[in-house]
Design a protein with these regions (language model features):
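A conserved ligand/cofactor-binding region detector
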Residues: 2-268
């Protein structure tokens, strides 16, 4: 009998599933190099947040971030201020003395960051800390030193003098309640004193060592000295103390830093 043919074996193809290629890892945001302007400004903010205001990144309020940012900018401004005043003293320069009853300073933080060419640096430093410069700057209350065109003109003059490297000092009054707020009560307008110093101001530097005694009232005592010259002396006065506060004024590009000196009255 003929042999039966064995059925041919079916070939089975084994297909192995390929593992999907791993997705490329997301690139981490580049951190500023140690010692870079952004890193230094960021560290200065954190240092003031901790050492000056006893806060950390978790407990800090928006106002704390504003104060710490102002202090970080002020550090750099004061270094230039000291250099400027040392140069003026060594050259025995003549100064312009500008007197005004009001100064409308505007937003001091943003203006100083622009003049010191630190705006981009501060923006990047705050962004690393999870903060936005515009929102932080909104915390700044207007200085109660003036309101109107003449006050704004006086502030612009001080900016211009510093930008032009002209030695100058502005003089004014350290108002405690310079302006007022308007509210409505029972359909009537009510004025309320606006204490702009309630939360302190990081730009003010108290100078008690330059205080002066200011005599008030009294009478004039006339006399003659040994040479027969007539002398007049104010006696029986009531005295007040004038205590100065300085606000550094930076010119554009930080070339010079002059200052505005405001006088506060205190009991003698």
């Amino acid at each position: 009998m003929p042999k039966k043919k064995k059925p041919a074996k079916k070939s089975v193809k084994v297909v192995t599933a390929r593992k999907p290629a791993p997705k490329p890892a997301k690139k981490a945001k580049a951190q500023p190099a140690a010692g870079s302007p952004v890193a230094e400004f960021r560290d200065a903010i954190l240092r003031h947040l901790k050492s000056t205001f006893a806060r950390d990144r978790v407990t800090a309020t928006r106002n704390d971030w504003w104060m710490a940012t102002c202090m970080a900018a002020r550090d750099q401004m004061l270094a230039r201020y000291i250099d400027t005043q040392a140069q003026h003293a060594s050259k025995n320069v003549r100064r312009v003395y500008y007197l005004s009853l009001e100064y409308l300073m505007g937003r001091v933080l943003t203006n100083n960051l622009v003049n010191l060419q630190l705006r981009d640096v501060a923006t990047a430093a705050l962004a690393e800390l999870g903060q936005d410069l515009e929102k932080v700057a909104d915390e700044e209350a207007d200085m109660g030193l003036g309101n109107g065109g003449l006050g704004r003109l006086a502030a612009c003059f001080l900016d211009s003098l510093a930008t032009m490297d002209i030695p100058a000092i502005g003089y004014g009054i350290h108002y405690e309640f310079g302006l007022f707020r308007q509210t409505f009560a029972q359909g009537r307008q009510v004025e309320v004193a606006d204490n702009w110093l309630a939360n302190n101001n990081p730009w003010l530097i108290r100078r008690p060592n330059f205080r002066v005694s200011v005599p008030l009232y009294g009478r004039v005592k006339h006399s003659t000295d040994d040479r027969g010259n007539h002398c007049a002396e104010l006696v029986e006065t009531r005295n007040l103390l004038g205590v100065p506060w300085d606000i550094p004024i930076a010119g554009f590009a930080g070339s010079s830093v002059n200052f505005l000196r405001l006088w506060e009255s205190k009991a003698a």
